[in-house]
Amino acid sequence: MSAVLKPQADLAIADISLADWGRKEIKIAETEMPGLMAIREEFAAAQPLKGARITGSLHMTIQTAVLIETLKALGADVRWASCNIFSTQDHAAAAIAAGGTPVFAIKGESLEDYWDYTHRIFDFGAKGTPGEGPNMILDDGGDATLLMHLGQRAEKDLSVVANPTSEEERILFAAIKAKIAQDPTWYTRKSAEIIGVTEETTTGVHRLNEMSAKGTLLFRAINVNDSVTKSKFDNLYGCRESLVDGIKRATDVMIAGKVALVAGYGDVGKGCAQALAALRAQVWVTEIDPINALQAAMEGYKVVTMEYAADKADIFVTTTGNKDVIRHEHMVAMKNEAIVCNIGHFDNEIDVASIEKYRWEEVKPQVDHVIFPDGKRITLLAKGRLVNLGCATGHPSFVMSSSFANQTIAQIELFTKPDAYQAGKVYVLPKVLDEKVARLHLKKVGAQLTELTDAQAAYIGVKKEGPYKADTYRY
């Protein structure tokens, strides 16, 4: 079949006939994901996630399929939706659905469907019964967590969803109001048993920290993003490979010789700059932080403002996690055929709403020409959403093994040791677990560790088996 499955089924995918293709790619990915496979082997007998009901909101890719099957192998019950309307790989969703996991993810789904699916991943049991909702959330960007918090507030006071400031907020607020009209205590009940959330990305961590600081975070949280084996690998090395993959698949453009502007020089920006420089682009960087700006300059990149670069650069990449990084006045000033894309989590880094009034011409899915009144056109990729997942398939399996090993370990930590973590607080995994994730991946790349002697360990004041660095160490 090639149509979306019937709405009454406990899933929403594009095409179940893609399951065999998805399964073949999952098998390939498993060979490149040694961390997850080692965790399965270590914990399968103990079933540490038995009894866990995990609501998952994370890009429904082949690599995520391996994560889902790892969580299930450790005993968890899982319901899953994508955290981005363009990031789903439909054959991955089909393979997971064919295995019996409720999946709600279709590449190119509408925002209305997106929020409907995000609601549906909380429906574990019958209304008013124990186990009605999840007891764990695995989040990427914080939308599932946001939904529970905003929904509970709206149950008490609908005015909190009365004044949307964007089209996405309008759709989200409408979905919340409709749910409350249908079931006035749905959000309170669905979140009643949640032990905690593990958060994948920088943007979601910002949301968690804000709620924790205000005293409004309802449950425990582990910040997976700031594990070294996530942020210094997924964010940097993953983006270093997947950014250019997305740009190339979308445009077939020659990178060499072009001026490429990277907005932001954090871990993601560093990886993007390295990738573009490796293909011999002239890389320019914008930054607000003097330390990051100096780092970029010391790497040989020209540090400029967006106003300076707008009419000069050929390729623009936003990586900041902030909003309005590329605004209307910048796009008006750009060259004809400038390429504009984003690799930050949300679509508000580029002010796409400000150019919706102009004529759009779809070149192919997720590649649009925006034609200005003077006839100039820019090429906008993935409508300002994640270019590496909208126009390609995201990060390679190996680096996602490192990220998802952290996610799995974090889920085990929160679920099995809830008393060790205080509700309303945000934690990072202990360094010993961070080092464990790294160890699980060394053999695959042929790396051999040097072992300290007793005397050496005593001299520098560490245990022979680690951890080897202070928590304040900057890798």
UniProtKB/Swiss-Prot annotation:
Chemical reaction(s) catalysed: S-adenosyl-L-homocysteine + H2O = L-homocysteine + adenosine
Cross-referenced CDD domains: SAHH
List of residues binding NAD(+): 201-203, 235, 264-269, 287, 322, 343-345, 388
Keyword rRNA-binding: no
Keyword Transcription applies: no
EC numbers, comma separated: 3.13.2.1
GO cellular component, one term: cytosol
Residues at which substrate binds: 61, 140, 200, 230, 234
InterPro entries (alphabetical): Adenosylhomocyst_ase-like_sf, Adenosylhomocysteinase-like, Ado_hCys_hydrolase_NAD-bd, NAD(P)-bd_dom_sf, S-Ado-L-homoCys_hydrolase_CS
Location within or outside the cell: Cytoplasm
GO molecular function terms attached to this record: adenosylhomocysteinase activity
Pathways per UniProt: Amino-acid biosynthesis; L-homocysteine biosynthesis; L-homocysteine from S-adenosyl-L-homocysteine: step 1/1
UniProt GO BP: L-homocysteine biosynthetic process; one-carbon metabolic process; S-adenosylmethionine cycle
Coarse class of the protein's main subcellular location: cytoplasm
Cofactor stoichiometry and binding remark: Binds 1 NAD(+) per subunit.
Cofactor: NAD(+)
Domain of life: Bacteria
Keyword field: Cytoplasm, Hydrolase, NAD, One-carbon metabolism
Family: Belongs to the adenosylhomocysteinase family.
Function text: May play a key role in the regulation of the intracellular concentration of adenosylhomocysteine.
Protein name (database record): Adenosylhomocysteinase
Biological classification of the source: Bacteria, Pseudomonadati, Pseudomonadota, Betaproteobacteria, Burkholderiales
Gene that encodes the chain: ahcY
